[in-house]
Amino acid sequence: MLKRCLLIVACTVLGMVLTAQEHKTLREWGFPTGIFQPGQYNAITDVPGVAVGHVTLIEGDSVRTGVTAIVPHQGDIFSQKVPAAIYVGNGFGKLAGVTQVRELGNIETPVVLTNTLSVAAGIEGVVRYTLMQPGHEDVRSVNAVVGETNDGRLNDIRGMHVTPQMVIDAINMAHGGPVEQGCVGAGTGTRCFGFKGGIGTSSRVLPESLGGYTVGVLVQTNYGGILEIDGVQVGQQLEQHDFINHVRKAEHVDGSCMMVVVTDAPLDSRNLERVAKRAMMGMAKTGGIASNGSGDYVIAMSVAPGNLIDSRAKTITSTVLANGEMSSIFAATIEATAEALWNSLFMAEGMTGKGGYHVDALPVDRVLEMLRNRR
């Protein structure tokens, strides 16, 4: 009985915090985008071995934040590092671990996303997680990759409520299969185009004639611009976009976006950087403008089993995709990134947070009508 009462209280509180609407991705509403097909889950976890975990922190009237962990493979990541690259679309952000990734071309930990003032907790959590793994008793240096967006309008960000243990929990809870989207994990308190943002994900599987590779993307959306969905000027029609306060009084929306791209195509860090650049093109397709105050970062990784980097090896031999075979992966990255960004909006709920501030969800019914009328 006690457990049942607690569940009822929790649901009641969440009902006051979140404004519910039916949750479907853009594709589930009947609007597939792009020319390539998604994987089974239309998620980053369609890439074999990739897992995602969330810790969502909603407490009282003002705590609206969390942690999202992306685990690139199920082995010892520190010993079997993944080829990686990071591309900075606009550098107004606090992404940790950038310089070593750029110098060495690999990532040796799970990738963690959280809020701006919890990056330090994220680093500590990732480091502690890595040090406690079997065989790491002599490890004295860990390059934790921790990204962020600023959820300080809805969340009491100054309270620094995220703890290192929450980061460890998110990593340990990471799983394959369907990925929770919307107001979860690092996307709990984010805003996007003036609406409630969050976590979004999507994937593309290339035909066998193009290699059969999978590209998966996960995003944390907290950015602005003039929302465009599959070519439809949604933000303009809804009169909700950046710079509209030059026409009528409205709040200017700014912010950041973290994009994580994973593929099983055998790529080195150089071509992964080229892939990461294409994710920014996907962001542009949504109407994002990489504004002055936006931290827009892309983390790209390859988890092709034969190309993992053995930290104990003195020489490394790998087979990588030729430059001439990259174009289809570029296109798949653009498609999956754009759809992941849109999904973060479609899957989010309106939320009330710090100081009674409220952010509405994307008005899905109106948007669907616009998309249907376009046809």
Predicted regions located by residue number:
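Intrinsically disordered, low-complexity sequence elements enriched in Ser/Thr/Gly/Pro
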Residues: M1-L2, T25
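Sec-dependent signal peptide recognition
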Residues: K3-I8
